[in-house]
Amino acid sequence: MSWQAYVDDHLMCDVGDGNTPASAAIIGHDGSVWAQSANFPQLKPEEVTGIMNDFNEAGFLAPTGLFLGGTKYMVIQGESGAVIRGKKGSGGATLKKTGQAIVIGIYDEPMTPGQCNLVVERLGDYLLEQGL
């Protein structure tokens, strides 16, 4: 299966009631884009560095916030070294780190944070099981 198929079929999928993430991507730890939805924001190198720093040192992004394509998200409870969650108004983002990649989902209402977490973390867990 291509990386784009993972994004299209497993991240940008209907989670019920017609809700889908607003955008999603799978990127390498170096920030290289493996696959993304059409409207996923272009990440800046310093944003990827901040994300990786937070995965390596929990709480790194808390003082400054999580930035994705220049949009700031308030960092909320995640899982140290594995999951970063951000909130912005009625939307937010979930990031799951695997051995080689970062799975990212960005959502807006009516999708709930829990629905986005489920979609992103389920794919991330699968990739981890596959050694990716």
Curated annotation (Swiss-Prot):
It comes from the Eukaryota. Keywords: Actin-binding, Allergen, Cytoplasm, Cytoskeleton. One of its GO terms (cellular component) is cytoskeleton. It is found in: Cytoplasm, Cytoskeleton. One of its GO terms (molecular function) is actin monomer binding. SMART domains: PROF. The keyword Cytoplasm applies. PANTHER family: PROFILIN, PROFILIN-3. Binds to actin and affects the structure of the cytoskeleton. At high concentrations, profilin prevents the polymerization of actin, whereas it enhances it at low concentrations. By binding to PIP2, it inhibits the formation of IP3 and DG. This is Profilin-1. It comes from Parietaria judaica (Pellitory-of-the-wall). The gene is PRO1.
